[in-house]
């Protein structure tokens, strides 16, 4: 198995302490339901024009889906966005399985400058059309992808990545508003109709543990010398 991780707070120390072959506890996954693509008829999928939009570490879960489609004779286009060149993941692997791979960076350090939405706009301006969009990445990125795809009339699936504590839906940390329903990403998701997700609420809830993350990071870096009571230096 391969794992890609975005380390937050005290988790940053994992990068320096773990070596190949080491083990760590308190890790569970995968959670929720598999991609809805596996439930669709392959012959019908072959008739569709599918585009994936991946942001940052969202490239990691996009890759196996694109690879699975490729192995079943379906070539999907992929748009990969990242803050800079150093944060582009799995480029060569993605090239081998994607119909077309489009890369963009926020700072213009690689290929082109802009967001994934800019690439999709340009593709549509060139006459490209898509029947389905699958977006995986930061919440703010998926929000703006969905605003654009709704305008363009492209059905869109998003893979939500809220904080998950117990992974069973009991803690409520991954609670989402999807249309008129309350959903829990760890059991009902992670995939939902992107045009129904309340992204503003999701982003607000994502900040729930921001202060604790900062304090944990400070404790990991400074040990017993830190105070951290006021939280101003998080």
Positions of the model-derived regions?
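Short Fe-S-cluster ligation motifs
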Residues: 184-188, 192-234
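Short secondary-structure transition/capping segments
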Residues: 24, 76, 125-132, 156, ...
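A generic structural signal for secondary-structure junctions
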Residues: 8, 99, 121, 150, ...
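Glycine-rich, flexible loop/turn motifs
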Residues: 3, 27, 156, 182, ...
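Short acidic, glycine/serine/threonine-rich loops at helix termini
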Residues: 146, 169, 197-198
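Local cysteine-cluster metal-coordination motifs and their immediate loop/turn environment
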Residues: 59-61, 139-140, 161-191, 225-234
């Amino acid at each position: 198995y391969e794992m890609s991780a975005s380390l937050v707070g005290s988790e940053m120390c994992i990068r320096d302490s773990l070596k190949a072959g080491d083990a760590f506890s308190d890790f569970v996954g995968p959670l929720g339901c598999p991609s809805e693509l596996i439930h669709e008829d392959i012959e019908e999928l072959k008739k569709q024009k599918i585009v994936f939009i991946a942001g940052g570490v969202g490239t990691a879960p996009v890759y196996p889906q694109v690879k699975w489609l490729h192995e079943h004779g379906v070539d999907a286009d992929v748009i990969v966005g990242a803050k800079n060149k150093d944060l582009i993941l799995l480029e060569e692997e993605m090239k081998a399985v994607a119909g077309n791979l489009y890369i963009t960076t926020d700072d213009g350090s690689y290929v082109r400058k802009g967001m994934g939405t800019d690439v999709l706009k340009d593709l549509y301006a060139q006459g490209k059309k898509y029947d389905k969009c699958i977006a995986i990445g930061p919440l703010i990125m998926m929000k703006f992808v969905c605003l654009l795809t709704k305008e363009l009339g492209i059905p869109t699936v998003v893979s939500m990545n809220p904080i998950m504590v117990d992974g069973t839906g009991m803690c409520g940390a991954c609670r989402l508003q999807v249309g008129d329903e309350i959903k829990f990403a760890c059991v009902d998701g992670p995939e939902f109709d992107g045009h129904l997700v309340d992204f503003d609420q999701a982003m607000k809830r994502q900040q729930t543990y921001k202060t604790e993350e900062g304090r944990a990071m400070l404790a990991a870096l400074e040990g017993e010398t830190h105070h951290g009571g006021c939280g101003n230096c998080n």
